[in-house]
Amino acid sequence: MTREEKLQLIRDRQKAVRDAWSREKTLVWQGKGTVNWNSEQQRELMEKGRVSGYEGQHMKSVSQYPEYASSADNIQFLTHEDHLAAHNMGKVNEQNGYHSVTNGYYDPETHEMHSFGNNPPHAPEAHELSNPCYKGAENSYSQSNGNEQKREYSKLASNAEYSHESNVGKNMSNGYAMWR
């Protein structure tokens, strides 16, 4: 692989994670998420575009499946420990790091990998958040709160826009639940 090809692969990986965070932000705005974010995490996502303590995991390893490197559908959000466990058969192993190949959705609750086999990756299923902070925010802000909160709503709404094709609004069911 040439130097330019390696650099392009790095850009593709970063794009996939950025796009997945954008999609997650849109989902949270709708009261959903691929992770059951608490209210502080939802606010952080809306304000910063990501949630500290979470990493974008390429479900189909880029080393073996470079064709999916730039796909947001190939990303799931995991804590650092769960990300390591996904690469190390359910065990957190700092020494091995992220070098083990993955090909599936890692369930952090059961510590099981659900293989994609020869199929392309698909985005983790979105669920209703247990404590949504933004779903229906426009109505509650505009009916009962002052202009300052309306401006904050407008700011958050414009930041939550997701401009490119995604699975938002489509059936994202894949049979794997991030929480029950």
Protein language model features and the residues they cover:
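Nuclease and nuclease-like effector domains acting on nucleic acids or nucleotide cofactors
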Residues: M1-E55, V62-W179
